[in-house]
A protein has these predicted regions:
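Hydrophobic ligand-binding cavity/cleft-lining segments
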Residues: 1-39
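Intrinsic-disorder/low-complexity, polar/charged segments enriched in Ser/Thr/Lys/Arg/Asp/Glu/Gln
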Residues: 3-9, 16, 52, 67, ...
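Hydrophobic pocket/interface hotspot
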Residues: 19, 23, 29, 53, ...
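Residues at helix-coil transition
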Residues: 24-25, 34, 77, 142-144
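Hydrophobic-ligand binding "helix-grip"
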Residues: 30, 36, 44, 58-105, ...
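N-terminal glycine/threonine-rich, aromatic-flanked beta-hairpin/loop signature
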Residues: 46, 51-55
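A conserved amphipathic terminal alpha-helix motif
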Residues: 110, 117-149
Length: 149
């Protein structure tokens, strides 16, 4: 972890295709992306290079939310996603860039996340904690293999 950036690494017992789908599908994305205690509403999600997204994280305890949006900069199916985003709140200035690598390994997918340009008013450790929770939720979504009845 360096100032204004965080880096995370996980190995997930699911295929890169399944993990990638969790990023690409708006309904799936809204279930695992917000940290614990938050819900997510997606107003726009055009998952393609140059496509825009807009969403809101809502604190379930207080009902207060913060909105943010951005653009998908690079997408390579089942391998790589890069997007920019910024908060609507003028007190959280600047644009962040997030890069996600998916690498097929013997037990599933090696996932690496790097987020850069985090606003100075957000402590990096708070952002890191949020990402840890987010990735726990992602893992709980993609690791189970549930057959159709």
């Amino acid at each position: 972890m360096t100032n204004n950036s965080v880096s995370l690494h996980r190995v997930i017992k699911a295929s890169p295709e399944k993990v990638f789908r969790a990023f690409a599908d708006p309904v799936a994305h809204s279930t695992w992306l917000p940290p614990y205690g938050f819900i997510c509403t997606i107003q726009q999600m055009d998952f393609k290079v140059g496509g825009k997204f807009k969403m809101t994280f809502i604190n379930f305890s207080t009902g207060n939310g913060h909105s943010f949006g951005g653009e998908y900069l690079e997408i390579k199916a089942n391998e790589y996603i890069k997007y920019s985003d910024k908060f609507d709140d003028p007190n959280l200035p600047g644009e962040m860039t997030t890069s996600i690598w998916l690498n097929k390994v013997s037990v599933g997918t090696e996932l690496k996340v790097v987020q850069e340009g985090i606003p100075d008013v957000i402590p990096a450790e708070m952002c890191y904690l949020g990402w840890q929770e987010t990735l726990e939720k992602l893992i709980k979504l993609v690791e189970p293999e549930i057959p159709d009845a």
